[in-house]
Amino acid sequence: MSTHHVFVYGSLKKGQPNHHELLNSNNGQAEFITCAQTKEPYPLVIATKHNIPFLLNVPGSGKQVSGEIYSVDQKMLEFLDWFEKCPDWYQRTSIQLEILKGNGESGRIEEASVYSKINFEPDWLNKPTHESYDTNGDHGLKFVCREDRKDD
């Protein structure tokens, strides 16, 4: 069985509103591997009226972003592509990550796929950037789940 490593930094992380999608075996299989951060800084911004976290594909700008690496099967990868509206909304690209903890491997560099934005509103680059995302964070911008959105 072919597996893929995927880095999640927003609503799919443990404790966040969409994490249940990774746990739902109807979507495929996902196994938590470890915590990591981007090797390079990237802008992690919260945008749109739904307060969605976006990793903007602008390496060298912003901050090193922390998140989680999951090993997913092909079915889950296809689900995540659908869920993230890839390639129209997010684009799945490769990213270099630094392992933060786990089995004495801190500091090791790993490559994984990430859902990031290549095309975005120019003013998003002026938004505050974050090292880590939490819907209940100090930013005060609570994520609006799809089922609670009035216009989607």
From Swiss-Prot:
- Database matches in SUPFAM superfamilies: Gamma-glutamyl cyclotransferase-like
UniProt keyword list: Lyase
A single Pfam family, by name? GGACT
What is one term from the GO cellular component aspect held by the record? cytosol
Q: Where is the active site?
A: E84 (proton acceptor)
Any single biological process term in GO? modified amino acid catabolic process
Q: Which Gene3D superfamilies does the entry link to?
A: Gamma-glutamyl cyclotransferase-like
Binding residues annotated for substrate, in chain numbering: Y9, G10, S11, L12
EC number assigned by the record = 4.3.2.8
Catalytic activity reads: epsilon-(gamma-L-glutamyl)-L-lysine = 5-oxo-L-proline + L-lysine
Q: Which family does it belong to?
A: Belongs to the gamma-glutamylcyclotransferase family.
The record's listing under PANTHER family reads: GAMMA-GLUTAMYLAMINECYCLOTRANSFERASE (PTHR12510:SF4), TROPONIN C-AKIN-1 PROTEIN (PTHR12510)
Under which name does UniProt file this protein?
Answer: Gamma-glutamylaminecyclotransferase C
Source organism (scientific name) = Danio rerio (Zebrafish)
State the organism's lineage: Eukaryota, Metazoa, Chordata, Craniata, Vertebrata
Name the encoding gene, please: ggact.3
